[in-house]
Amino acid sequence: MLDISGCNDAIKSYDSIYNFNRDLIKSIDMTAHGDPVIEYLLPGDPKQGFSLMQLITTSNICAHFVEPDGSAYIDIFSCKTFDILVAQSVVQRHFEPKKMRVNYITRNAG
């Protein structure tokens, strides 16, 4: 889970979010299952912005990008391990946040 703030204007762009999603999936070696759902939600609300949902073969990636305050909340849920530092690098490259808080949970059902 990555909570970021002080982002650039890429969080306001459908195309930028779409390209971020593609780059993230490739960089952390996941496989997309279908196309992402990217919708603009809550117009006029303090939390308005794009939300992203992408199924991956090992679970999903979800995010919400809050336009008014330049923050975003990104969840990468996968039963396949991935390099969180690579994910952080992709987020940094696309959105240039001034702050990033990371919570990484290693899953193990066995």
Where are these regions (language model features)?
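Polybasic/polar functional segments that serve as interface/processing modules
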Residues: 1-110
